[in-house]
Amino acid sequence: MKRTYQPSKIKRVRTHGFRARMKTRGGRAVLSARRAKGRRKLSV
């Protein structure tokens, strides 16, 4: 059986990156929540 996590930098950035988060309203909500919480890293 193949493992579920097959690392790829491109896929990681395209789905979880900053610009991907900024594209949608929900993604911007995620970023603002992480800013409010004081996260050092907002996105991948």
UniProtKB/Swiss-Prot annotation:
A Pfam family: Ribosomal_L34
Protein name: Large ribosomal subunit protein bL34
CC per GO annotation: ribonucleoprotein complex; ribosome
Domain of life according to the entry: Bacteria
GO biological process terms on file: translation
UniProt keyword Transmembrane present: no
Family: Belongs to the bacterial ribosomal protein bL34 family.
HAMAP family: Ribosomal_bL34
InterPro entries cross-referenced by the UniProt entry: Ribosomal_bL34, Ribosomal_bL34_CS
Biased composition (Basic residues): 34-44
Keyword annotations of the record: Ribonucleoprotein, Ribosomal protein
PROSITE patterns per record: RIBOSOMAL_L34
GO molecular function per UniProt: structural constituent of ribosome
Annotated stretches, region: Disordered: 22-44
Highest classification ranks of the organism: Bacteria, Pseudomonadati, Pseudomonadota, Gammaproteobacteria, Methylococcales
